[in-house]
Amino acid sequence: MGLEARGLQKSFWQRRVVDDVSLVINPGEVVGLLGPNGAGKTTTFYMVVGLLPPDRGRILLDGDDITDLPMYRRSRRGIGYLPQESSVFRKLTVEENLLAILETLDLTARERGERLTGLLRELSLEGLAKQRAYTLSGGERRRLEITRALISSPSFLLLDEPFTGIDPIAIAEIQGIVSRLKQKSIGVLITDHNVRETLEITDRSY
């Protein structure tokens, strides 16, 4: 069982940009979706995420057809998404950014506090907890974004260009985080123009 795309097709203005693409992401597996500009990788990625509907083909999650489910319902089914664009609240602190998501869950104040402490520790954000998001470096912000995406305890995490705009040290940190996600049996799909950095951590790539 896992996250699967079968026979995806997509055309824009009578030009087919994705033609019969299939892929599978298993739990605890890191998969790359790579290719040059114009190869259709971003379009394929967006169809898996739920940002674009396919013209043909299906998206399956653990054997269930989720092709027609909107993005928020896919999230409830365990598919997390980290967009390339910054998704943090810039004027809030790191811990306030996390609490903003935690408060949408059915948790007591004590449970929220415990989850917050665990999340800050897990991705080494304790020292940044009181810092406002707009003061973070690119790598620190990316760590915060991944932490926010993990709050809903996804089974699969889809990362759009996670290595773009960050320095080599931050890239190594993100690679380490992805490896830890794999150890927790979270399936990860990465699309990125940084082919070498992506191939260093993927089990296989399309």
Question: At which residue positions do the language-model features occur?
Answer:
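The feature captures the beta-strand-to-loop junction immediately N-terminal to the Walker
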Residues: 34-36
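Catalytic Walker B motif of ABC-type/P-loop ATPase nucleotide-binding domains
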Residues: 157-161
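Conserved ABC ATPase "signature" region
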Residues: 99, 110-128, 175-179
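Conserved catalytic motifs of ABC-family nucleotide-binding domains
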Residues: 153
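Helix-to-loop junction immediately C-terminal to a conserved catalytic motif
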Residues: 49
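Conserved ABC ATPase signature
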Residues: 132-136, 140
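ABC ATPase NBD coupling module
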Residues: 65-80, 85, 90, 109-113
